Every structure is written in C-alpha cells, then in structure tokens.
C-alpha cells in the first residue's frame, strides 16, 4: 500500500524546478489548490524566501520576519524566472509564491489574521542586503534579466494570492496582509 501512495505522489507532481544556470521555472504547478499553498523556488546563490502565516483567535496574531544577507556576487550574471501555463489557476485559499533567479534576492509573503483589535506594524519586516563585486576595480557590467508570467497563471483563483517574482541581483520584495475580525 505504501508503494502505491508513493507512486501516486510522484506521478501527481507538477514541474517546479530550478537549475544552476540561474533559471527558475514553474510550469502548470499548483492547479486547483485548496487551503494554504506556499512555494519557494530559487535558482542561483544566496536567496532568502519566507511564506509566513499567523492566525489567532481571541488574541493578537503576529510574526517577526528578519532577513539579513551579506555576500559577494557578480552582478553581470544572466537570470530568468518564469511562471508558465495555467500554474496556480482555479485555486481557493491562501497562496504564497516566491520565485527568484540570480543572487542575493530576499522575499517575504506574510498573512496575519486575528479576532479583536490589533495594530499592523511593517517594522517587523526588516531586511538588509549588501551585494558586492569580488573585485571593486572591475568594470561594472549587467547581465540579461527576464521575468515572465503567463496570462493563464493564477486565473480563477480566490482568496489571498501573494506573488514575488524576480530575476537579478539584490532584489527585496514583501507582500503583507493583516486582517482583524471584530
């Protein structure tokens, strides 16, 4: 019985692959998701990605997300990120997608839901990023960057959809949503 479940799991997987050539590709993955779906995909070096969910009944939902990154990278690298086909279409719930290609990219998707009064403070999302060339005397060059999202991706989805998609060096992105029900 275990082997049949394993086979079903392997056959039911969709493509969400990244390679060492700084190319991230999600193709037709996550269709008809229900509930909470969190996807972090990175191709390249030194990426930080968070999908955070905090739910509180009768109290205060909070999360503190801190990312710090210090590394040497070459900004001339080529990078591409793509979400293709009908990926994440016709879903229902909370979806968080972080997709990056390149180096030293930071991404956060955060959702806080609570009952009762609550203040929303964006200071809890603290990010620091330093990107340095290995040799500061080298001439500055820029590589090719490409980000693609299919016009069929995410169609028909309901609920919360948070997407960060980047190709390059030293990008910082955050999507935050705070909901209080009184």
From Swiss-Prot:
Keywords: Amyloid, Cell adhesion, Fimbrium, Repeat, Secreted, Signal. Disruption phenotype: Deletion of just fapB in an overexpressing strain yields cells without amyloid fibrils. Deletion of the entire fapA-fapF six-gene locus shows no visible growth phenotype. GO terms for cellular component: extracellular region; pilus. Residues 1-18 form the signal peptide. Coiled coil: none annotated. It comes from the Bacteria. One of its GO terms (biological process) is cell adhesion. FapB_R repeats lie at residues 22-58, 80-114, 150-180. Forms fibrils in vitro; in the presence of FapA the fibrils are slightly narrower. A minor component of purified amyloid fibrils. Fibrils are resistant to boiling in 2% (weight/vol) SDS and require >90% (vol/vol) formic acid to dissolve. This is Functional amyloid subunit FapB. It comes from Pseudomonas fluorescens. The lineage of its organism: Bacteria, Pseudomonadati, Pseudomonadota, Gammaproteobacteria, Pseudomonadales. The gene is fapB.
